[in-house]
Structure formats: C-alpha cells, structure tokens
C-alpha cells in the first residue's frame, strides 16, 4: 500500500532492538503478564500510550534552552498562559504536572459528596478522582459508543435524552458538572460533534450546570469535525478548537498528548471564585500557581507544542497514520473498534478471543500475547482497567473489552505500522492458543497499572 511521507525531517534517532521470542516470554512472565511492568529496553515498538511519548520539534528543544526556572513568576508560565488563553479562550489557567493533577484539582473544587458527574464514558483516573471526592459517575454517552462493530461518525456524542433524564431524576443541583471528553478514549478515540457540544451547552445553561471538557486530545477531535461535520470543511483547526471551548466553562488538559511534550498539564476555567480557590489548592498539591509542579522549560515546550499541534499538515498526518494501521488490520479480518479514532487502534478482544470469558481477562491476555509474539507493547482497556464498584466491590463490566495500540506522535513511521499490523495478523491466525489470565496481585486503586497475573 502506498502512503504519504511524514511532514517532518528526523534530526535525532534512538536505537531499538528486538529480543528473541524466548526472552520476551520470560520478560512477560517476570512482569506478571502486565505490559505496564515491562522494561522499555525490552520493547521493540512501544504502543502502550501516547501520553508523554511524543517526539518534540527543533523549536520545542530550542525553547527548552530559555527555561526561566524562577520559583515564582516564570516567564515561561506567562507564555503558556497567553497561548492557552488565545487558543482555548478561557479566562484563567492553572498549570499542573500532568492531566491527573488537573483532575484532582477540579474534583476537589467542583464536587460535593453525594453529587453526580455526567459524562460521555468514564476514564480511569478521571473517575477515580471524581469518586474519591464523593461523586458518582453516570455514563450518558450515546449507546452506539459501546458497540465496537458500528462504523458511525461522532460516536463520542452525549445522548441528550440521557442527560435530560438524569437532570430530571437527580435534580440539577445534584449534578456537580458535565465531563465532556474530546475525544472519548475508551470508546476508541471517538470524537464529539460540534453540534452535540452546542446542544449540551444549551441544555446545561438552562439548568445552571457547568461543563468541563477533558481536552487532552482536543486537536484530534477538531480534525474529525473539519473532516466529517458539514460546514467546517473550510474552517481552520485553530478556529474549530476555539469554538469547541466556547461551549465549556473550563477544561482539564494533559499536555502529554496534544501539546506534544513529555510532561505537563493544566486546568482552565472562567469562574473567578473557582480560580481563586484553585490557586490556593495548587500550592498544596503541585506548587506555585505560576509553575504547578513543572520546570519553566517544560512550560515553554508545552506552549510551543500546542501551537504546532494546530498545524493542519501535522494533525492530518497524525490521524491518517493511525487510520492506516486500522485499515490494514481490518482488511485482514482482525476485529477492531470502528471507526478508527484519533490516537489509537483498539482491537476488539471479545471477537479476537471468543473462547475467553470476560472473567478470564481477554484483553489483558491478548496484550500479553501481542508482546510475546511480536515485541510490540500495547495496553489492556477492558474489565481490568474498569476496576471495581465502590458500592458493591464487584467488577465493573464494560461492554467494550479492548486492547489499545496507541501511536506516539512524530515517533514512528508508516513502516513501523506495517510491522505492527503484520505481527498482529499472524497472531490472529492462531488466536485460539491465547490463554486466559487471573489475578495473583490486585491493587485496590487503579489496579491495571501494577496488577500481576498468571495463566488460568
């Protein structure tokens, strides 16, 4: 298959090597069949995550050299603040060490115990902070998002009827805020339409309910709007992003994705009282409001990276490279989540491993098998990631049981995608050999990061 050249030149390289299959089997066993616990030196192609694994540009590296490491009032913070205000349109920004820090602040600031947070599908760390602060997360994403085989645009949209029902049943005063993820990670990187954002904003405004976006992959979402939503084909990515955020009261952001850096994040809001409280709280958990746990050089790189992410040539290449991998797997009959999203290809582990029940952790088993057979590291996104109910202690049982092949930005070429696809296609041809797993160590919180498993 023909494919376009990358829209960049490579100035620095890192040597990688493939260890033998016997060695990979041994390494996987030592890691308790958890791909998070593998050593990076033993990975050939690392598709665990797109978080903090980006390649920075020459301009970002140059910006690192003008890092102002003052404890307070760093010039790099003011550059970041100016950039975010211009591109997102929010009045205030509080930097954090990464997106999780912003989630922590928002949850403490916006949630009262006993309230509900409505959102378009959960995310692991986001829901953890919401529940830790006394909220119950309610999934109001459209039903189609839970069906891996449906190829529909904007599967990340909120179901407005579900939102209206929740407001009626629980009362607007009992909804802390609406958490709108753009894009929806665990649905397969599915985008949200501008029309849906606008409609959610209108309904929320009627009831006085705040909306906070999980903006981590907002630029990817903007690309899908430009590509697929009528009326936006001639609108710039920058202008689409700005309109997206005009329908929100604030956002959490992990800079480790669409800001094209290795560390960093921020919390945005328009409300003055919340901003004052956030500045007090960030000192406790992150650092001064002008650095939030970050070095000045990292804030500078984040400001530059956010502008670079808005360049059409970059984001087109980014999304189409992911789509290329998805297309190649689909054409070979490998079951994936449809349509391919913006940051990853999600293998449908239920269809890939139909001989395994959900209690045998098919996605975890598949991720381990992919590494042992191909040297590619991926991530489980199914029942293990979903965790347990805080009320009953029983496993959450997501309808989607997937393995995420997450493409780092500006790191791999199309040739790497070919290698990944060929290896997984070969594995699929003897999928019945994949064995189920069970816990040998289960952490109480965010278990997927450090759990250990063995074959049943």
Swiss-Prot record:
Q: Which GO terms describe its cellular component?
A: cytoplasm
Query: What Enzyme Commission number(s) does the record list for this chain?
Result: 4.1.99.2
Q: Which residues carry this modification: N6-(pyridoxal phosphate)lysine?
A: 257
How is this protein induced? By L-tyrosine.
Q: Which reaction does it catalyse?
A: L-tyrosine + H2O = phenol + pyruvate + NH4(+)
Q: What class of enzyme is it?
A: lyase
Q: According to its UniProt record, where is this protein located? A: Cytoplasm
InterPro entries, sorted: ArAA_b-elim_lyase/Thr_aldolase, Beta-eliminating_lyase, PyrdxlP-dep_Trfase, PyrdxlP-dep_Trfase_major, PyrdxlP-dep_Trfase_small, Tryptophanase_CS, Tyr_phenol_ly
Keywords from the UniProt entry: Cytoplasm, Lyase, Pyridoxal phosphate
Q: Which domain of life is it from?
A: Bacteria
Cysteine pairs bridged by disulfides in the record: none
Q: Post-translational modification, briefly?
A: Contains L-DOPA (3',4'-dihydroxyphenylalanine).
| Any one GO molecular function term | tyrosine phenol-lyase activity
> Where is this protein chiefly located?
cytoplasm
The answer to whether the entry has keyword Lyase is yes
Its needed co-factors are: pyridoxal 5'-phosphate
- Give one GO biological process term: tyrosine metabolic process
HAMAP family reported in the protein's UniProt record: Tyr_phenol_lyase
Binding partners and assembly: Homotetramer.
The protein in question is named: Tyrosine phenol-lyase
């Amino acid at each position: 298959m023909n494919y376009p050249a990358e829209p960049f030149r490579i100035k620095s390289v890192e040597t990688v090597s493939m260890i033998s299959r016997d060695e990979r089997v041994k390494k996987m066993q030592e890691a308790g069949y958890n791909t998070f616990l593998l050593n990076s030196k033993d990975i050939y192609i690392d598709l665990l995550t797109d978080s903090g694994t980006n390649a920075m540009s020459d301009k970002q590296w140059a910006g690192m050299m003008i890092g102002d490491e003052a404890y307070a009032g760093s010039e790099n913070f003011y550059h970041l603040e100016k950039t975010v205000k211009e591109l997102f349109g929010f009045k205030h920004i509080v930097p954090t060490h990464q997106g999780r820090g912003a989630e922590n602040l928002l949850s403490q600031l916006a949630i009262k115990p006993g309230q509900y947070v409505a959102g378009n599908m959960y995310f692991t760390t986001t829901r953890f902070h919401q529940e830790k602060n006394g909220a119950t997360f309610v999934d109001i994403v459209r039903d189609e998002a839970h069906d891996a085989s449906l190829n529909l645009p904007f599967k990340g949209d909120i179901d407005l009827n579900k939102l209206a029902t929740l407001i009626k049943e629980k009362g607007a005063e009992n909804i802390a805020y609406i958490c709108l993820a753009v894009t929806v990670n665990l649905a397969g990187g599915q985008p949200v339409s501008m029309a849906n954002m606008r409609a959610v904003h209108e309904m929320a405004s009627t009831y006085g309910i705040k909306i906070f976006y999980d903006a981590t992959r907002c630029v990817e979402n903007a690309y899908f709007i430009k590509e697929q939503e009528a009326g936006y084909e001639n609108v710039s990515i920058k202008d689409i992003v700005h309109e997206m955020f005009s329908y929100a009261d604030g956002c959490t952001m992990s800079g480790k994705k669409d800001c094209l850096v290795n560390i960093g994040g921020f919390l945005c809001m328009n409300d003055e009282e919340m901003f004052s409280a956030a500045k007090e709280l960030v000192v406790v958990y992150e650092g001064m409001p002008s650095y939030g746990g970050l070095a000045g050089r990292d804030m500078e790189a984040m400001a530059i990276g956010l502008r670079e992410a808005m360049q059409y040539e970059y984001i087109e290449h980014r999304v189409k490279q992911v789509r290329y991998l998805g297309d190649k797997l689909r054409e070979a009959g490998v079951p994936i989540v449809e349509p391919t999203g913006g940051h990853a290809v999600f293998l449908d582990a239920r269809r890939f491993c139909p001989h395994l029940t959900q209690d045998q952790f098919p996605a975890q088993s598949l991720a381990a098998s992919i590494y042992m057979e191909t040297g590619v590291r991926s991530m489980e996104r199914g029942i293990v990631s979903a965790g347990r109910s805080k009320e009953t202690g029983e496993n959450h049982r997501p309808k989607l049981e997937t393995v995420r092949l997450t493409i780092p930005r500006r790191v791999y070429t199309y040739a790497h995608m070919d290698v990944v696809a060929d290896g997984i296609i070969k594995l699929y041809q003897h999928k019945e050999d994949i064995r189920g797993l069970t816990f040998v160590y289960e952490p109480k919180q965010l278990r997927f990061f450090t759990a250990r498993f063995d074959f049943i």
